[in-house]
Amino acid sequence: MAENFKYTLWFLAMAVLLGCESDREDIYTSNFKSYPLAAGSDFDYTGLATVRELRAGGVELEITLTGQKSTEPYFYPAHLHFGAYDSPDAPMAQMLGPVDARTLESRTVITQLHDGSVMDYNRFMVFDGHIKVHLAEDGPDYNTILVVGNVGANANMKINLEKMTMCSPYSF
């Protein structure tokens, strides 16, 4: 009897775990695209930005960095900008969820940009933009870019860090 109870408990636990995973996957369509994020400074980080189409509309943008994790809570600010990474005037299109230094991950649902325009998967694929993740939210470390990458229509542009422009935290 105790053996049957263990199997029943194990089966229920697996059903709950698998059920939670499928619920999460049900929020997406099959459309997604990943963009590489290049090191933007002497800090040893690279990454990947993955955009997924949401069934309810809009997109989820997930940033995953590769590099040194922290054991302390700290968050790297991340932004989606209009224009390519080397555009001299590239205003912020959307503040993204900060990257947690402990997990090196961030997720943001985007349905509308700061300018009021609607964002969906098809628009993101042709969006003239780029992503930057900063070392700090303000102060001198704000100008330190951990990773940078073009997205949407700019995805095939090669990154040349000498041409990277800084961004204003208040340019939206």
Question: What positions do the PLM features span?
Answer:
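C-terminal motif of bacterial Sec signal peptides marking the signal peptidase cleavage site
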Residues: 16-19
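N-terminal leader/targeting pre-sequences
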Residues: 21-77, 82-172
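Bacterial N-terminal signal peptides that target proteins for export
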Residues: 1-9
